[in-house]
């Protein structure tokens, strides 16, 4: 399997870039310390999504950083992405695994303990615990799970846990203290005017706690 460092996990959102280049901003984020990237494109058509994914995959492979595709198995296959991230209403994980193979990373979003248990049982490589805090980037997000839920999951679930939802410089230390393997960040990076600098600050917080 490809290198699976979930510690600082960037989830893209082009709507926060205010016209800036996605490729350039992702490149800066990686330079600042991002260890994994998920391309999340809810509005793009298939061709645009494919072209973005292809460009990012070429760039990130050279940098040694895995690219995961949100939801779209066809895009993940088409660009030979390093993995796929699935939600509870997306394609069933075992089906995705049968098509992607054992070497690819497959993550699953969970919001409940039973979903976490089922995800681990089905062979997810990691679980995205979402949202840990209330988040501005997902209007239809379920209620925040909170830190206690994340910490309690860590006591039960053996596969990596990645926290997502409302994570920033002010609360990243608390995420690390739960025993989570990583933090997925959207607006704290994608909305930053200096994405490299912000990524470096987040990386420093993670490393020293």
Swiss-Prot record:
CDD domains for the chain: TMP_TenI
Functional description taken from the UniProt entry: Condenses 4-methyl-5-(beta-hydroxyethyl)thiazole monophosphate (THZ-P) and 2-methyl-4-amino-5-hydroxymethyl pyrimidine pyrophosphate (HMP-PP) to form thiamine monophosphate (TMP).
Cofactor-binding details, from the entry: Binds 1 Mg(2+) ion per subunit.
Name of the protein this chain belongs to: Thiamine-phosphate synthase
Transmembrane domains' residue ranges: none
GO molecular function, one term: thiamine-phosphate diphosphorylase activity
Species per Swiss-Prot/TrEMBL record: Syntrophomonas wolfei subsp. wolfei (strain DSM 2245B / Goettingen)
SUPFAM superfamilies the record matches: Thiamin phosphate synthase
Family according to the record: Belongs to the thiamine-phosphate synthase family.
Pathway given in the UniProt record: Cofactor biosynthesis; thiamine diphosphate biosynthesis; thiamine phosphate from 4-amino-2-methyl-5-diphosphomethylpyrimidine and 4-methyl-5-(2-phosphoethyl)-thiazole: step 1/1
InterPro entries: Aldolase_TIM, ThiamineP_synth_sf, ThiamineP_synth_TenI, TMP_synthase
Binding, 2-[(2R,5Z)-2-carboxy-4-methylthiazol-5(2H)-ylidene]ethyl phosphate: 135-137, 166, 186-187
Keywords from the named record: Magnesium, Metal-binding, Thiamine biosynthesis, Transferase
């Amino acid at each position: 399997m490809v290198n699976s460092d979930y510690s600082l996990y960037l989830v893209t959102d082009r709507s926060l870039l205010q016209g800036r280049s996605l490729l350039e901003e992702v490149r800066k984020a990686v330079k600042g310390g991002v260890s994994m990237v998920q391309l999340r494109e809810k509005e793009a058509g298939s061709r645009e999504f494919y072209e973005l994914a292809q460009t990012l995959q070429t760039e990130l492979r050279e940098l040694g950083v895995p690219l995961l595709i949100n939801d779209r198995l066809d895009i993940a296959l088409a660009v030979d992405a390093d993995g796929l991230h699935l939600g509870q209403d997306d394609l069933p994980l075992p089906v995705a695994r049968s098509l992607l193979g054992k070497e690819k990373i497959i993550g699953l979003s969970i919001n409940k303990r039973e979903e976490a248990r089922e995800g681990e049982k089905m062979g997810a490589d990691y679980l995205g615990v979402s949202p840990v805090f209330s988040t501005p980037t997902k209007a239809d997000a379920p209620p925040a799970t909170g830190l206690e839920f994340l910490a309690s999951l860590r006591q039960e679930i053996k596969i990596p846990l990645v926290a997502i939802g409302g994570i920033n410089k002010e609360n990243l230390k608390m995420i690390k203290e739960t025993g989570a393997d990583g933090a997925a960040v959207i607006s704290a990076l994608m909305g930053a005017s200096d994405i490299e600098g912000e990524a470096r600050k987040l990386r420093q917080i993670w490393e020293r706690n």
